[in-house]
């Protein structure tokens, strides 16, 4: 695809699809304290890259953790050494997000004969964010934002197939996104 064609495609997409909101559709749970635990400190997430799972816990007043749910997630392909591990937190929660493919993602798609635009709108079959996006404070070695997001293709969930992010079934991810507030602790294990 030529540069002129790409520019024309981008302009066409801007006409056909509304531009994303400047701040995204972020949520923040402002509910009052529950059982003496502030909302941002109420939940704890642990993600296992090798175990392809995400576990949600509720923190108890005594400092313990009560397991609530474990979800399968798609994680980074074996040998891909760009993902961060360790503690962090949720920095944003978005519904029906746009996808801004990284240069690496665009390269992979180009190798498959698909020229991705710089921004892929919600609902588009090539939007790999699915129905939700949860941004994390974790960053890759190159400074890219790390995310938990939906998967429009369910075969990606529960396997080591992503370019680094965590892919969940859309319905399960929406459940998670509606449960946790921004500020929730997240620990990523290898």
What is each model feature region?
Residues 1-9:
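Bacterial N-terminal signal peptides that target proteins for export
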Residues 22-24:
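Boundary at the C-terminal end of the N-terminal hydrophobic targeting segment
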Residues 29-146:
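Gly/Pro-biased beta-strand-loop elements
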Residues 149:
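Histidine-centered active-site/metal-ligand motif
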Residues 155-164:
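Short, basic/aromatic beta-hairpin or loop at an interaction surface
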């Amino acid at each position: 695809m030529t540069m002129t064609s790409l520019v024309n495609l981008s302009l066409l997409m801007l006409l056909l699809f509304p531009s994303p909101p400047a701040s995204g559709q972020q949520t923040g749970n402002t509910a009052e304290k529950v059982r003496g635990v502030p909302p941002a400190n109420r939940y704890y997430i642990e993600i296992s890259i090798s175990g392809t799972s995400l576990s949600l816990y509720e923190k108890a007043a005594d400092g313990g953790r009560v397991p609530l749910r474990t979800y399968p997630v798609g994680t980074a392909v074996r040998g891909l050494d760009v993902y961060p591990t360790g503690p962090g937190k949720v920095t944003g929660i978005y519904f029906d997000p746009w996808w801004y493919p990284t240069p690496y993602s665009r390269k992979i798609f180009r190798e498959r004969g698909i020229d991705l635009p710089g921004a892929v709108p919600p609902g588009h079959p090539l939007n790999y964010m699915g129905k939700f996006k949860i941004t994390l404070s974790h960053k890759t070695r190159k400074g890219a934002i790390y995310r938990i997001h939906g998967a429009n293709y369910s075969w990606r969930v529960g396997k080591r197939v992503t370019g680094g992010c965590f892919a969940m079934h859309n319905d399960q991810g929406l459940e998670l996104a509606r449960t946790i507030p921004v500020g929730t602790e997240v620990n990523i294990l290898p």
